Regions:
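P-loop NTPase catalytic phosphate-binding loop
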Residues: 1-103, 110-176, 193, 218, ...
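Conserved P-loop NTPase
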Residues: 179-238
Length: 238
């Protein structure tokens, strides 16, 4: 078992870690400027530093440019639909306990689902169903989904099957809306005195890892995001 660093506990300064094979599905929520992409790149770098058999599939719906060149399996805007279908097909062909880690990263997932609902509601329900299946069944095949988005809502997934519960790592950065806080961390609280005065800035927020308590997280400060992306390109091309 190799532990991946996710950030640091703001209260005790200890690293927050997780076993990617047990907790591979990740959801990161936060508004513009909250540090979502930095958190994603930081966690991804940790995985690529420990594992060589990692296959990345990245959908950058709003063309942020933060992930370009990291993998050849990269799509933007409407092509993200095809990328999800491609990954799902690979998942179906993958055997249990596959040695390779396969990760589907969907940046601005909520925006993508909103757009697809307006364009083709039937196709959107089909895509949401595939994402739900990946969340429920992907872990045993080491096929993982990372959803990066500005808000969290149960409407982003098929109703009645609890797809959100299958994210083993939930990260909320910056000031969360009431709905996002409830969807991500319902019934979970920090120490009362600390939480009452906690006003997270960029790179700070809350994290809930499966089997661990809710904690306040600090993502390491990275001044040059472009350099981080370049390092990831180098890692994936080795």
């Amino acid at each position: 078992m190799a532990l991946i660093n996710l950030g640091f506990d703001l209260q005790n300064r200890f690293p927050i870690q997780a076993d990617i094979f047990r907790t591979g599905h990740i959801c990161i929520v936060g508004g513009t400027g909250s540090g979502k992409s930095i958190a994603t790149l930081y966690i991804l770098y940790g995985i690529l530093s420990l594992y060589h058999e990692v296959q990345l599939y990245i959908g950058d719906f709003k063309k942020s440019g933060d992930y370009k060149g990291i993998t050849k399996s990269f799509e933007e805007f409407e092509q993200v639909t095809g990328l999800i279908e491609k990954f799902y097909g690979i998942f179906e062909e993958t055997e249990e306990n596959s040695p390779a880690i396969k990760i589907l990263i969907l940046d601005e997932y909520a925006g993508f689902i909103t757009w697809l609902t307006q364009k083709d509601k039937k196709k959107c329900e089909e895509i949401k169903g595939k994402i739900a299946n990946l969340l429920m069944l992907g872990r045993s095949r080491h096929c993982y989904v990372w959803c990066i988005q500005q808000r969290m809502s149960a409407q982003l997934f098929p109703s009645g099957i609890g797809a959100i519960d299958n994210f083993q790592i939930l990260i909320g950065l910056g000031r969360l809306s009431v709905d996002s806080r409830k969807s991500l961390f319902a019934g979970e609280h920090l120490d009362k005195d600390f939480e009452e005065g906690y006003s997270p800035i960029c790179g700070q927020g809350l994290i809930l890892v499966d089997g661990q308590p809710l904690r306040a997280i600090q993502i390491p400060f990275i001044k040059d995001k472009g350099r981080m992306t370049a390092l990831l390109r180098k890692k994936t091309n080795q």
